[in-house]
Amino acid sequence: FPTRRSSDLPTWGDKVDKQWGKGPEIFTPENAYKYGKWLGERYMNAPNLIWVIGGDRSGDGKNFAIWNALATGIKSVDKNHLMTYHPHGEHSSSFWFHNASWLDFNMCQSGHAQQDFAIYQRLLLPDLNKEPHKPCMDGEPRYENIPINFKKENGRFGDDDIRHTLYQSMFSGACGYTYGCNDIWQMFDTGREPKCDADTPWYQSMDKQGA
């Protein structure tokens, strides 16, 4: 069996760039580097860990220096683990960090709006042809049971949509695949306020066809 690995996110994206999160924005390039170095020292010998910088956020503007410092801090002491970057929707880590020495493989996010192969022609295929050559994968494809483009009137992504993203990305040369479910990511249950129109308790969604 393949070795199981844990994707570790050093911080939620809203602590760098609030956007739709709660914040507060607490990081600067200086404290991000120190925090990254501390994380690297603490977990450098941990088995089966993959660092995922970003957290559904842009790497542009003021964010660039902060994310770069965080990643550089970790890698300054931790040479043992792979590292990538989780961008916001319909973007790729390669847009900002392809040539960064700490980026071991690219991650794109096809997101929750597109329904055809064109999104991979825009994101994944160009990444695979960039130099230096690095692997790439879709870190956040459409989630099962999430409204298409976040609007209930558009319908919801089903198990067939999940299979489409799997086939389209993997047959294009991706190095892996991510499954997501709207009800599971937020641990939705009756009595909890739903995000993105979640409607099924998470423990029931564990048995959805796409899973």
Predicted region positions:
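Short, flexible/disordered intra-domain loops and linkers
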Residues: 19-21, 61, 149-159, 189-198
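Short, structured coil segments at secondary-structure junctions
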Residues: 99-102, 132, 172-173
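A structural signal for short, well-ordered beta-strand segments and their strand-loop junctions
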Residues: 52, 84, 138, 178-181
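Active-site mouth of glycoside hydrolases
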Residues: 4-105, 109-117
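Active-site clefts of carbohydrate-active enzymes
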Residues: 57, 90, 94, 103-105, ...
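Aromatic- and carboxylate-lined catalytic core of secreted/periplasmic carbohydrate-active enzymes
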Residues: 135, 144-146, 160-211
